[in-house]
Amino acid sequence: MDVNIAPLRAWDDFFPGSDRFARPDFRDISKWNNRVVSNLLYYQTNYLVVAAMMISIVGFLSPFNMILGGIVVVLVFTGFVWAAHNKDVLRRMKKRYPTTFVMVVMLASYFLISMFGGVMVFVFGITFPLLLMFIHASLRLRNLKNKLENKMEGIGLKRTPMGIVLDALEQQEEGINRLTDYISKVKE
């Protein structure tokens, strides 16, 4: 199946008034995780544009350290994903504790970059856009169009870059399992 780039959402949809933002329910982690994953899929192009602008600004100010930081993060992330698919202990950790898995990748990247002296460039150029994406995805309430787009992605009618990344982190598999369970119950 071809990979489709999600459309750029309008600014007033991406960042509407305060009535479309709410604090997540920290007691219900699965609901919070569902909101984050749904928003990451729906607003992925907006997140990419914001991250590209921030990375470009930091990259303009310190190009060598920014390129070095990007290479280290990609290599560490690829190494952890490869290890998680080949080592059962890491695979279970990634499945049960996805936030911990991402934090370990970021910490490993931090320590590798600190050896090269580009820690601040890494922190502001790479992790700050990721932090902003996570905060927005956590606080932004979903709308009906968001939910519909996510169902299409979940059942495989659409394939997007963020969907591929979330599949690599095994964050969409649970939603697909719930959807197939629901469909089988409806058929009975």
UniProtKB/Swiss-Prot annotation:
Keywords: Acetylation, Cell membrane, Cytoplasm, Cytoskeleton, Endoplasmic reticulum, Membrane, Transmembrane, Transmembrane helix. Induction: By methyl-beta-cyclodextrin. Up-regulated upon induced differentiation and in heat stress. The chain crosses the membrane at residues 36-56, 57-77, 94-114, 115-135. Residues 1-35, 78-93, 136-188 are cytoplasmic. It comes from the Eukaryota. One of its GO terms (biological process) is negative regulation of mitochondrial membrane potential. It is a multi-pass membrane protein. The modification N-acetylmethionine is found at residue 1. Residues 103-117 are annotated as: Required for homodimer formation and heterodimer formation with ARL6IP1. It is found in: Endoplasmic reticulum membrane; Cell membrane; Cytoplasm; Cytoplasm, Cytoskeleton. The keyword Transmembrane applies. The keyword Aminoacyl-tRNA synthetase does not apply. Residues 136-188 are annotated as: Targeting to endoplasmic reticulum membrane. One of its GO terms (cellular component) is membrane. Regulates intracellular concentrations of taurine and glutamate. Negatively modulates SLC1A1/EAAC1 glutamate transport activity by decreasing its affinity for glutamate in a PKC activity-dependent manner. Plays a role in the retention of SLC1A1/EAAC1 in the endoplasmic reticulum. Belongs to the PRA1 family. Homodimer. Heterodimer with ARL6IP1. Forms multimers. Interacts with ARL6. Interacts with prenylated RAB1A and RAB3A. Interacts with SLC1A1/EAAC1. Interacts with RTN2 (via first transmembrane domain). Does not interact with VAMP1, VAMP2 or VAMP3. This is PRA1 family protein 3. It comes from Homo sapiens. The lineage of its organism: Eukaryota, Metazoa, Chordata, Craniata, Vertebrata.
